[in-house]
């Protein structure tokens, strides 16, 4: 199903458990958005095969602009980096997942109560801002890049991993000015959607090749486990199974049925 996560709270996000926030000491370099394998060989004139449609590296965003999507790719990768346990956010298709989520009722805020009055209240009263997920991303990314340009003369995506981490920590600590959007609220939105994309069903654009599930030995949407119910301690030998690719969960008919 598409994301049904609650609006971000005003509390500080809970610490990440397995990897730890900003964890992972293996390869932290960015995964290119475009593959050189897709280029034609100029020497012998051979045309390279077209990239597969499901390759996250060749995805073209639908909701985000190119600059916004580049920020998203790098920010998600710092939150969920590649390490010895498996691929990072970009290889898992997390930015693609978030981009596609923004085109759904969830992204438009249709699943949240979004009517006035909007007042400052205690965290237990829940989300109190007039911004949908679309609004949070659109309203935050440009000020973040502006902040990076002022301090480092480069947008977020062009910063070193160390400085990218500093910016994300500032967001998490509510230390960046994003106009009317509290930076901690945006950070929680980004962090939540990143984790959703890493472990969603692949039908929704994330968890490419079910690598997120494989890291956790999660069996996915397999329908029958009867043969394994009473085998205590036995290792489950079958790989994960995702939802059938049809119907497309982002089709208008599917979205109308969910709504």
Where are the regions that the model predicts?
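Mature-region segments of soluble proteins
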Residues: 2-9, 13, 56-58, 64-74, ...
